[in-house]
């Protein structure tokens, strides 16, 4: 149960971690493949276009996944690598995160099975982590993405917050335009553009505040009235 009068929603890619996890997954899936460098560049460009709001997130996600044939074992490799990419100021402030975990959610267009290990290592609650999930066949093989999941859709973060009935003061922290969607929820919702890992002018232009590191986010809460 949330005891405080605020809810903090964190993005994952380029926020909690310093990179885009799908870009790294692409490098793993395509290693030793012909034209892998060219395909990875295309995937990274699509990631950037989606984060800047130049194409919809759903369009960006679908186009990126078309380039990849993802196998289950790829996630084992990805999870081993990702623990080395947690943002420095996030590591520094793990105690604060754990102390306030009842009020902290993760909303991400990334994959929940990738996010969960990082979230747990930071002391956050797995049942407050929301991300995209795969559909599996009877033999356990990945059949595709669950496009019924709200986070696979454009405007998904807003739709998810609405579905969860979030009525507290909402503070969304992230690096992309998809994170700013939360401002549609309520006039009191605050979007903080997170720039520790990447800074996008189009995102800063619509942000209520900027955080160079997670220390700035903590300062915001310290100064809340």
Which positions does each model-derived feature cover?
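Anion (oxyanion) recognition and catalysis
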Residues: 98, 120-123, 165, 184, ...
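Short, acidic/turn-prone active-site loops that include or flank metal/cofactor-
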Residues: 131-136, 195-200, 214-219
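Amphipathic coiled-coil/heptad-repeat helices and related helical stalk/stem segments
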Residues: 86, 90, 154-157, 176
């Amino acid at each position: 149960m949330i005891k405080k009068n605020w809810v903090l929603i964190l993005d994952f890619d380029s926020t909690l971690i310093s990179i885009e996890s799908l870009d790294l997954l692409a490098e793993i899936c395509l290693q030793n493949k012909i034209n892998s460098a060219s395909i990875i560049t295309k995937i990274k460009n699509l990631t950037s276009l989606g984060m800047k709001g130049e194409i919809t997130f759903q369009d960006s996600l679908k186009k990126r996944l078309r380039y990849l044939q993802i196998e289950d074992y790829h996630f084992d490799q990805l999870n081993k690598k990702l623990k080395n990419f947690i943002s420095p100021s996030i590591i520094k402030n793990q105690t604060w995160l754990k102390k306030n975990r009842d009020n902290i959610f993760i909303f991400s267009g990334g994959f929940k099975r990738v996010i969960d290990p990082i979230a747990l290592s930071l002391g956050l609650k797995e049942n407050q982590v929301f991300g995209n999930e795969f559909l599996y066949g009877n033999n356990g093989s990945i059949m595709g993405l669950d496009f019924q999941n709200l986070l696979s859709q454009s405007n998904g973060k807003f739709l998810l917050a609405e579905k969860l009935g979030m009525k507290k003061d909402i503070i969304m922290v992230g690096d992309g335009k998809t994170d700013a969607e939360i401002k549609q929820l309520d006039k009191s919702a605050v979007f903080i553009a997170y720039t520790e890992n990447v800074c996008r002018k189009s995102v800063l232009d619509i942000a209520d505040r900027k955080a160079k590191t997670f220390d700035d986010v903590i300062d915001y809460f310290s100064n809340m009235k």
